[in-house]
From Swiss-Prot:
It holds the Pfam family Glyco_hydro_19. Belongs to the glycosyl hydrolase 19 family. Chitinase class II subfamily. This is Acidic endochitinase. Keywords: Carbohydrate metabolism, Chitin degradation, Disulfide bond, Glycosidase, Hydrolase, Pathogenesis-related protein, Plant defense, Polysaccharide degradation, Secreted, Signal. The active site is at E91 (proton donor). It is found in: Secreted.
């Protein structure tokens, strides 16, 4: 019985490995050097977030969310990381300050419009916005962000955790960004009717579709795609199809 028990246990581990569900450390995909390469100018002295977004804070936050950057095969994991940093680099911007081109300049800003005080304005990599999101994110990461929203701009690990929480969490009729980029989202009939198809473009729709999607070609969507293309090039993976949301209705329109 011990022999067969060992065989079954080993078989289960092999199954988890082959299906990409065996827990892995995000650091095996995102090394410190890769982090610095993707976010090359985040510590430019002209950036308001200089020295805030650290590699160690990212890894600590990432490893607290099972599945983030560890789902699927090597290509799938790299695409998720490229997409996450593509979207959040657009949110935190700074491309105009970069001598290496507009898509090497993300993670320059920390607070939306460099505001101060305890309002629920955009903060951190995903620019977490609105009391509801601060409440939900805070409960998920066990921090009181309703009464202390600026923790998202003063604690780098908390800041990354709020961004990854948003990335991993479906809300209403929106799938999670994680499920979209890892190929685990199947569009509903309503999604198909709204031209919301699997790909990076739907992630833009999830994050800011009401402003950016369904309006034809526009600079903001192009910027998000530019960051993503740079990241997948660095990681040597293909970007996939359906990168924009130019012709997608946003999720609020059902």
């Amino acid at each position: 019985m011990k022999f067969w028990g060992s065989v079954l246990a080993l078989s289960f581990v092999v199954f988890l490995f082959l299906t990409g569900t065996l827990a892995q450390n995000v650091g095996s995909i995102v090394t410190s050097d890769l982090f610095d390469q993707m976010l090359k100018n985040r510590n430019d002295a002209r950036c308001f977030a200089v020295r805030f977004y650290t590699y160690d804070a990212f890894i600590a936050a990432a490893n607290s969310f099972p599945g983030f950057g560890t789902t699927g095969d090597d290509t799938a994991r790299k695409k998720e990381i490229a997409a996450f940093f593509g979207q959040t680099s657009h949110e935190t911007t700074g491309g105009t300050l970069s001598p290496d081109g507009p898509y090497a300049g993300g993670y320059c800003f920390l607070r939306e419009g460099n505001q101060m005080g305890n309002g629920y304005y955009g903060r951190g990599p995903i620019q977490l916005t609105g009391q509801s999101n601060y409440d939900l994110a805070g409960k998920a990461i066990e921090q009181d962000l309703v009464n202390n929203p600026d923790l998202v701009a003063t604690d780098a690990t908390v800041s990354f955790k709020t961004a990854i929480w948003f990335w991993m969490t479906p809300q209403g009729n929106k799938p999670s960004c994680h499920d979209v980029i890892t190929g685990r989202w199947t569009p509903s009939a309503a999604d198909t009717s709204a031209n919301r198809v699997p790909g990076y473009g739907v992630i833009t729709n999830i994050i800011n579709g009401g402003i950016e999607c369904g309006k034809g070609q526009n600079a903001r969507v192009e910027d998000r795609i530019g960051y993503y293309r740079r990241n997948v090039s660095i990681m040597n993976v293909a970007p996939g199809d359906n990168l924009d949301c130019y012709n997608q209705r946003n999720f609020a329109e059902v």
